[in-house]
Regions:
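N-terminal secretory signal peptides that target proteins for export/translocation
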Residues: 1-2
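Sec-dependent N-terminal signal peptides
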Residues: 5-14
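C-terminal motif of bacterial Sec signal peptides marking the signal peptidase cleavage site
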Residues: 16-19
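Signature of long, low-cysteine stretches enriched in small and polar/charged residues
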Residues: 25, 76-77, 83-136, 240-272
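Solvent-exposed alpha-helical segments and adjacent loops
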Residues: 25-47, 102-169
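Secretory pathway targeting signatures of secreted, lumenal, and periplasmic proteins
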Residues: 25-30, 37, 44-50, 187-244
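N-terminal "mature-domain start" segment
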Residues: 26-42, 50-53, 57, 62-66, ...
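Acidic/His-rich structured neighborhood in mature extracellular/periplasmic domains
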Residues: 139-140, 148-220
Length: 272
């Protein structure tokens, strides 16, 4: 029996995703707590001024603002705002992502990391970095700093998934479920679509930050199906057939100047 391999391709901007067996966290948040403020992928760094201007601060800033992989133009992973410790009060306590750096050789003997959710506001993530010196903190960031950026990005995606779980395009989800027996929580702004056998394309026709989402399936024939070259070739074939360009003979394809990222994942304990 042949199984079918289902792919979801999010084009232009990766806005949403699905949450697996996750109850809505939005509904459970306390009504007595202020909601976190700020934009997605924005982080406030609270750090001593000398340390911020030194090696550790520069390294932390460079890691937080490193380009997002896979985009045709450089865009920073996070937008960084800085505050000195004495400025960290009032409304700044409600920023959605906060990195609080404390350097004190009389209190700390090594670098420690403490992560706390909803410290001052709901929907907030606070990371506290403790270190005995700026040099030791810099050495730690050289080895582990990118994992902190990846963690912040993961938390932003979780927030978006939680939001889309409770507020998404019902008709898009219904069509994908009927066609592919899968769920797709797309933004409510989706307005136009193309629906054929084994292929579904939906767009919001946005003039700024347009969102296109494509779902398609094809037969699984061998282990070679899950290689990067095969998946890219299949994607180009499907998009070339279904999404024509503005000029005769043009069509959507993979940009070859940027190597596609590829990662095998498991869902509910199954390879996919």
């Amino acid at each position: 029996m042949r199984t079918r391999f289902l792919l979801t391709l999010i084009l232009i901007v990766l806005i949403g995703g699905t949450a697996c067996n996750r109850s809505s966290k939005l509904a459970k948040q306390s009504i007595f707590m202020k909601r976190a403020t700020g934009f997605a992928y924005e982080v406030l760094v609270v750090m001593d001024k000398d340390a911020w201007k030194g090696e550790a601060g520069r390294l932390l800033y460079d890691q937080l603002t490193a380009p997002i992989p896979g985009l045709p133009q450089n865009e920073p992973a996070m937008r960084v705002t800085y505050a000195e410790p004495f400025q960290f009060n009032g409304l700044l306590h409600y920023v959605r992502n906060i990195i609080h750096v404390r350097i004190d050789e009389s209190l700390y003997t090594k670098v420690s990391v403490h992560k706390e959710k909803d410290r001052w506001a709901t929907g907030q993530e606070v990371v506290t970095l403790n270190a005995p010196s700026s040099q030791i903190l810099a050495e730690y960031l050289e080895k582990q700093g990118t994992s902190l950026v990846a963690w912040l990005g993961e938390k932003e995606r979780e927030r978006q998934a939680d939001y889309l779980e409770s507020s998404h395009s019902v008709w898009v989800n219904d069509k994908v479920r009927a066609r592919f027996n899968a769920q797709l929580y797309a933004p409510e702004e989706m307005c136009s679509y193309k629906d054929t056998a084994d292929f579904f394309w939906v767009t919001d026709h946005g003039t700024r930050g347009r969102i296109d989402m494509v779902v398609y399936s094809f037969p699984y024939v061998s282990g070679r199906t899950f290689t990067l070259d095969y998946l890219v070739a299949m994607r180009d074939s499907v998009l070339g057939e279904h999404i024509q360009g503005a000029f005769p003979g043009s069509y959507m394809t993979t940009e070859k100047r940027f190597t596609p990222s590829y990662e095998a994942i498991s869902k509910n304990g199954e390879y996919c």
